[in-house]
Each structure stands twice: as structure tokens, then as C-alpha cells.
Amino acid sequence: LVIVIFLKNLFAMSGLELAKLLDKRLKPNDIKSVNTMILTNKDNKKKTLELISISKDDSKKQMIWFLKPRKDKGISFLKIEKDNEDDFMTMWLPGFSRFRRIKSSQKSDSFMGSDLSFEDLTNRTIEDYNYNIIKTNEDGFYFLESIPKEIESEYSKHITKIKEVEDGIFIVYEEDSFDKKNNLLKNKVFNFEKI
């Protein structure tokens, strides 16, 4: 009985270890993508935006250009994440012929009228969070709780649903983000297609 308990503890993984495995997973350093964003308002009216996104240095630098609809064409967003400094974020608004600087205090603002905030467009730094595996299930999913330490955030925590799909390869399937009162604020679902 003692041996069985020892082996079970030997193979148990901490929340921090799981977060580090996710952070180190294979991913492209530079990405160029053409995306469609569909916004649906409370009256179920839809607005479709088309955009190009280019990310470099593990998404620490990102540029987004909006192509459609015509009234949003030319709007662009630039993000440069910095270590030990506030991130640099700005939007070019061609209708006003000016830039809008996004300050740290504005990171919870909506991005282009969507449910995404500017904070959602930034990478999370492992050292800025405390991690706990709050449960696992029979389907092999881990539920990882990430709680911000002292950083300014619109969130009190995130709960991420993760699965090991191959030996040492973990994929995020879903994430719930909670506001400062611990109410569910956002649910993100990630779909993958093998090509």
C-alpha cells in the first residue's frame, strides 16, 4: 500500500508544471493569418470583420489590419510586449487620422466592439500567476486554475481545460475567465483541425 501511494504521488503534476509544459509546447515563432471576426449584438444582428494578423517573437509583437467592412478598412492595431515595463499598444483610426494609445488602465476595454479585451490580446507571463490543478476527469482533461498575483487584470482567475493529446503534447480546449467578483465573464472554446 505504501508503494502504491508513493508511485501515485511521484507521477502527480503540479499546476505550475502543467503551465510550464503548455508554455513550452511547439508553436510557430512567427505567424501570419487571415481571420474573420463575427460580432453578434443583443438583437442577434451580425457584423463581419475581415483582418490580417502578423505576429513575431512568440506573439510578443503583433500587427492587425482590418480589411472589411469598408467603414472599418484601414483600422490597425500594434502591440509590443515588454519585459518589466508596460506593454505598448496603439490603434490607428483612419476616420480620425490619429493614433489611440492603449494605456495599462484601458486593457479591459473592448477590442473593436467585441467581447475580447485588449488584455485578451496579450501573452500571459508564467511568473505573474499562481496555478492549481483543480480537477481531472475520466476523459483525461486537466482543469488548470490561473490566479493573477499582483498584476492589474480585469480577471480574478481563469480555468483552462487542457488535454495531453500525445506524449508530452498538451492542447487547450476551453477556458473560462472570471471577473473580480468571481462571476463567469467569458468562455472561450478552441477548435482544432488536423491538416
Question: Can you say where each PLM-predicted feature lies in the sequence?
Answer:
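Sec/Tat signal peptide C-region and signal peptidase I cleavage site
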Residues: 7-12
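Short, ordered beta-strand-loop transition motifs
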Residues: 55-60, 83, 133-141, 194-195
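A short, amphipathic edge element
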Residues: 45, 121-133, 187
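N-terminal mature ectodomain segment of secretory-pathway/periplasmic proteins
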Residues: 14-94
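Gly/Pro-enriched, hydrophobic low-complexity segments
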Residues: 78, 109-111, 116-124, 138-195
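N-terminal export/membrane-targeting signals
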Residues: 1-6
